[in-house]
Amino acid sequence: MIRFFPLLTVLLISCSPLKKYPLKSERWENDIKALEYIDNEEMCGQDCILFVGSSSIRLWENIKSDMSPYEVVARGYGGAHFYDLIHYTERLVKNHNPKAIAVFVA
């Protein structure tokens, strides 16, 4: 859990504490469930880079060849924003033990 603290800190700092974010994170629930199902089939090794975030990650068709020789696992969904990612971070990351996590949201 200590490994997730820096990621969560960055995510929380990136979000304005004064702004009211809409509670629309549930709209990605089906996408997240599909990614959890994929996690049962494709695990991230200790030296992999886990890419999480919006559809830019999901639609990056050549991510494995573009990031070669690194092992990568892409977990992109919908049109994610930081407040969505905060909501789903544990579910997207908990089954992996990556060397690094790359985050991209619009």
What is the role of each PLM region?
Residues 4-5, 51, 82-83, 104:
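Phenylalanine-focused residue identity feature
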Residues 14, 76-78, 100:
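Small-side-chain structural scaffolding
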Residues 22, 72-82:
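Acidic/histidine-rich helix-loop elements
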Residues 50-52, 73:
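Conserved beta-strand elements of the Class I
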Residues 57-71, 83-106:
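Oxyanion-hole/transition-state-stabilizing segment in secreted/luminal serine hydrolases
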